[in-house]
Curated annotation (Swiss-Prot):
Species this chain originates from: Schizosaccharomyces pombe (strain 972 / ATCC 24843)
Primary location class: mitochondrion
InterPro entries cross-referenced by the UniProt entry: ADT_euk_type (IPR002113), Mit_carrier (IPR002067), Mitochondrial_sb/sol_carrier (IPR018108), Mt_carrier_dom_sf (IPR023395)
Ligand binding (ADP): 100, 112, 257
Keywords, in A-Z order: Antiport, Membrane, Mitochondrion, Mitochondrion inner membrane, Repeat, Transmembrane, Transmembrane helix, Transport
Protein name, per record: ADP,ATP carrier protein
Intervals of motif Nucleotide carrier signature motif: 257-262
Domain notes: The transmembrane helices are not perpendicular to the plane of the membrane, but cross the membrane at an angle. Odd-numbered transmembrane helices exhibit a sharp kink, due to the presence of a conserved proline residue.
Source lineage: Eukaryota, Fungi, Dikarya, Ascomycota, Taphrinomycotina
Family per record: Belongs to the mitochondrial carrier (TC 2.A.29) family.
Annotated control of activity: The matrix-open state (m-state) is inhibited by the membrane-permeable bongkrekic acid (BKA). The cytoplasmic-open state (c-state) is inhibited by the membrane-impermeable toxic inhibitor carboxyatractyloside (CATR).
Protein location: Mitochondrion inner membrane
Length: 322
């Protein structure tokens, strides 16, 4: 009897260690699959991403003398950029974007379930409203937590993508590459310059990621059932719809933060995100908050792909169900 008790006691730490190792292994796979899917999809959508940023920030570029006249639309922006800078320039800033997006998306996917468990809401026990709110909160918290670590890369990506050949300096660019963005910004504005627009970014990421993950997790078990369960196209379309809705809802905040980013290194800066929004509304009208939103919707295809591919790979490799 004593022997059995001793054996049972001795086996307890082993079982605990095994459980811990399994959890760590799952966390690692979540991290890697989310990151790889994100990197591939963002590279595929890089030309759309750059066009979106050029249209969104064109007024700041004109004020700084880096753009001669406004773009007439998505198609004209594509054509003009390719003609003036070459087709390869449509991927300008993509390296910084991949470096930023890999840890951001990977951390979002990896920590999403952990944040969800922290809220501890169950649909059957706590009701649909609390369960839905928990999904929104967990998605938002995951996005906001990772933003702090990668914001400077997002800033660098934005500056590189909007670094069109100068309209006043014979085609000269402002930055020579990723490292040059950091060097020049830090020299002119200090660390603060790399984090300009961080405030509205935090609010925007909570709104976007909260809806992005929260609504997808909530709608998945309702929509993707019966013949649609495990269907790649259905999963892709659901992800695209969620991405589009989330992007439109948070787009004005995205415009404000990127317009603030564009003033680092410039003589005139916005005193706050509120002041930035006020000036855009007064000088350019409400429509300016949504400049580039059309390209952003097209870019949403990449986000939908990340969600659906992630689900399919997990289902194939680990048998994880919706």
């Amino acid at each position: 009897m004593a022997t059995s008790s001793a054996a049972a006691a001795a086996s307890t730490p082993v079982n605990a260690n095994t459980i811990t190792e399994t959890k760590n292994s799952t966390f690692f796979f979540d991290f890697m699959m989310g990151g790889v899917s994100a990197a591939v999809s963002k590279t595929a959508a890089a030309p759309i991403e750059r066009v979106k940023l050029l249209i969104q920030n064109q007024d700041e570029m004109i004020r700084a003398g880096r753009l001669s006249h406004r773009y007439k639309g998505i198609g004209e922006c594509f054509k003009r950029t390719a003609a003036e800078e070459g087709v390869i320039s449509l991927w300008r800033g993509n390296t910084a974007n991949v470096l930023r997006y890999f840890p951001t998306q990977a951390l979002n996917f990896a920590f999403k379930d952990k944040f969800k468990k922290m809220f501890g809401y169950k649909k059957e026990r706590d009701g649909y409203a609390k369960w839905f709110a928990g999904n929104l909160a967990s998605g938002g918290a995951a996005g906001a937590a990772s933003l702090l670590f990668v914001y400077s890369l997002d800033y660098a990506r934005t500056r590189l993508a909007n670094d069109a050949k100068s309209a006043k300096k014979g085609g000269e660019r402002q930055f020579n590459g990723l490292v040059d963005v950091y060097r020049k910004t830090y020299r002119s504005d200090g660390l603060r310059g790399l984090y300009r627009g961080f405030g509205p970014s935090v609010v925007g990421i909570v709104v976007y990621r909260g809806l992005y993950f929260g609504m997808y997790d909530t709608l998945k078990p309702v929509v993707l059932v019966g013949p649609l369960e495990g269907n790649f196209l259905a999963s892709f379309l659901l992800g695209w719809a969620v991405t589009t809705g989330s992007g439109v809802a948070s787009y004005p905040l995205d415009t404000i933060r990127r317009r603030m980013m564009m003033t680092s290194g410039e003589a005139v800066k916005y005193s706050s995100s509120f002041e930035c929004g006020r000036q855009i509304l007064a000088k350019e009208g409400a429509r300016s908050f949504f400049k580039g939103a059309g390209a952003n919707i097209l870019r949403g295809v990449a986000g939908a792909g990340v969600l659906s591919i992630y689900d399919q790979v997990q289902l194939l490799m680990f048998g994880k169900k919706f």
